[in-house]
Amino acid sequence: MNANEEFPIEVSVEDVDALRKSDTDFILLDVREQQEYDTARIEGARLLPMSELRNRLGELEPNKDDHIVVQCHHGGRSMQVTQALRSVGFTRVQNMAGGIDQWSLKVDPSVPRY
């Protein structure tokens, strides 16, 4: 089994919640903009806006072999970033389907919707 088979391109918000509760080591990468992050965020998420990815990709290089779950508002930007990271050799990267909006609806209603 290759890494992409082991790590499907998408993961549900429920599965991400289970990862967090199991203390599984992974990075939750928030690719929204700072203003969005200030409005609503998942505790422990690391902000790296999609608009800055090209210039800041080197910050992720030490994590190239780590499990990274990418999230945004609804899942569109995070899917683009997931695909971009996979295209440059990050093999354990997944998109959180539905983004923080689905997180608010299905996992943690205390996270504001916007």
Regions found by a protein language model. Give the residues of each.
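Short, surface-exposed ligand- or partner-binding patches at beta-edge/loop junctions that are enriched
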Residues: 71
